[in-house]
């Protein structure tokens, strides 16, 4: 007869392929609960957090401050571009492979410094950079990207307009509806 009993530890493990399971290497249960609560409401007070997490206000404040100071947690406000009826796009950029590190770094610096770029990522595959940008209209997005990437060190780029976002920043923004 096989032993099918489970220990309490295995019952406490979150399901694989969940944020909680993946973040266990960085956050204990209380820190994860703090993250979840602040992700729902970034303005939640330490008193509300302590009630929700089951720790003292001082302990919650110390943990929140440690998470922020370590760079693991950042509390910020974002504009939900589709709700503001603004245009946004993903841009995949290929850098000329013959250019040196200084030229590549200059492109990245320019993208990071650009106010209408909200994400700059290095990637593997057909392109070197994955960039997200926004503007008033798609025509403005296109002109902005043209100007920004007018550089001999940029080999190629592709602009993909985004027309709908259902989920961002670990939040449902909308759900598909069947008409």
Stretches found by the model and what they are:
Residues 1-179:
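A compositional/biophysical signature of low hydrophobicity enriched in polar/charged and small residues
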